A protein has these predicted regions:
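Sec-dependent signal peptide recognition
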Residues: 2-9
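Bacterial Sec-dependent N-terminal signal peptides
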Residues: 16-39
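N-terminal carbohydrate-binding/catalytic regions of secreted carbohydrate-active enzymes
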Residues: 44-113
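Aromatic-rich peripheral "rim/lid" segments of glycoside hydrolase catalytic domains that contact
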Residues: 88-90, 248, 252, 257-308
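Aromatic- and acid-rich polysaccharide-binding/catalytic face
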Residues: 91, 120, 172-225, 257
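Active-site groove signature of glycoside hydrolases
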Residues: 110-132, 154-164, 185-194, 218, ...
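Active-site clefts of carbohydrate-active enzymes
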Residues: 155, 161-164, 211-238, 257-273
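Extracytoplasmic
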Residues: 294-423
Length: 423
């Protein structure tokens, strides 16, 4: 009953107005804020950290929980940095040409190792190049070493193939796991590769493997739908796809291809620069700093909330390195049919000020909702792409709530941060 009275009061008194900047410093803009979200347990990269581990791992480690390099071993320097940044390394048997003692030595040196990845794209002629019968001949040996070393085995990594008769990855899987001595009970996950050019295409591909009832590992992905993918298109693809992967409970892990590689001029997929100081690219900044959709985080009143750290999102929202004076990323393209949710924790019944740092190029509006109920529209003026402050006072009740911001027109809004402060 208390919540109902609160919503009625909000609907009755809520009025929105933009705070216009005055000459001089903008005292409403914080000098800095920190990330409070937890690292994603899913997020990783497919990469060999052999050349610049002392630079590359500190750059990616704050966001990455795991990695693999298509081989067995990891350098001592990289291993130490993986431990420092809480990254899990997964060795791989790339094809049937592997040695038990190599895996035994690795496991002895790395008792924390939990997974073993099986053959890399066996239905591609320039990769593992194994028909199901050939893979089955080696499979018992691989299952045996995984059990001996207490490693969870992940099924061969599948993509659309070039091996005659096995372009269809489902056909390869179905034939392989029907062979005597091979069983779905042998594996604890399915590895997949996908280079489609849209998040929807990736989702459709992944959904096709859910029939096997195993956790999905997307161990290679980026937009490589052609050899002419722009940096902007790649960034939008990455944000949309990672948002989908983080939200899908059937996706256990995913790994971006590739932090640094030869395809940069073709599809702009590099997370790391190829020249000194080898820093994060703009794409890398987004990969490292975008939302992990952390469901355990509740932002307390008085905390500056980076707009890119939404708890969940709807529609094709995008992110980019911010051009504001504070922050790392900005949320862009918040318009009709898109929304972002933030979990907030209010310490006591009181009136609080909601502050939005925004920019637009058209007069537009955002709908503000609390726990699924609309509180009203925030009418935003045209700021000519300049950053401005919007404020409104809200009476809020003690407890945890979900604050939602959704677009209402075709004209996009960019957000840098938001905050809720007691009057």
């Amino acid at each position: 009953m208390k919540l109902s009275r609160q919503l009625i009061l909000l609907l009755a008194i809520l009025s929105f107005s933009a705070c216009q900047k005055e000459e001089g410093p903008d005292t409403d803009t914080p000098t800095g804020y920190e990330s409070l979200q937890s690292k994603s347990e899913k997020r990783g990269v497919a990469f060999n950290f052999s050349q610049l581990p002392d630079i590359d791992i500190p750059n990616l480690g704050p966001a990455c929980s795991w990695s693999y390099n298509w081989g067995v071993n990891l350098s001592a320097e990289a291993s130490a940095l993986f431990a420092q940044y809480g990254m899990d390394y997964c060795p791989m048997a790339w094809n049937a040409n592997w040695n038990e003692d190599t895996f035994r030595a690795f496991k002895k040196a790395h008792p924390e190792c939990k997974y073993l990845l099986a053959y890399n794209e066996p239905n591609l002629t320039d990769q593992a190049n194994m028909v199901p019968a050939t893979a089955a001949e080696d499979w018992g040996r691989l299952v045996a070493i995984a059990r001996e070393l207490d490693l969870k085995l992940i099924a061969p990594a599948m993509n659309y193939g070039t091996l005659e008769g096995y372009h269809d990855p489902w056909k390869w899987y179905d034939e392989f796991f029907a062979i005597e001595g091979v069983s779905w009970d042998d594996v604890d996950g399915i590895a997949l590769h996908c280079y489609m050019g849209s998040a929807g295409g990736v989702k459709q591909f992944l959904d096709g493997f859910k029939k096997y009832g195993k956790p999905l590992w997307l161990t290679e992905f980026c937009n490589w739908s052609s050899n002419n993918v722009s940096a902007d298109a790649q960034m939008k693809y990455m944000v949309e796809t990672i948002n989908m992967l983080e939200a899908d409970p059937d996706v256990f892990r995913y790994a971006w291809f590739i932090p640094r590689g030869h395809g940069e001029s073709q599809c702009h997929n590099s997370l790391l620069g190829s020249k000194s100081p080898f820093a994060l690219t703009d794409l890398g900044k987004v990969f490292v700093n975008m939302s992990t959709q952390d469901k355990s985080l509740w932002y307390k009143a008085g905390t500056v909330i980076p707009a890119e750290h939404y708890n969940s999102c709807t529609g094709a929202i995008h992110l980019a390195p911010t051009d504001d004076s504070v922050g790392v990323l900005s949320l862009t393209d918040l318009k009709k049919d898109t929304a972002v949710d933030y979990q907030i924790e209010i310490p006591e019944d009181a009136t609080y000020t909601l502050t939005l740092r925004f920019s637009t190029y058209f007069e537009t509006a955002l709908r503000v909702s609390l726990d699924g109920s609309s509180l009203g529209l925030a009418d935003l003026p045209n700021t000519d792409y300049k950053w401005d402050i919007f404020k409104v006072d809200l009476p809020l009740s003690k407890g945890r709530h979900t604050l939602s911001l959704s677009g209402t027109t075709a004209f996009p809004v960019s957000l840098n941060y938001l905050s809720i402060n007691k009057l």
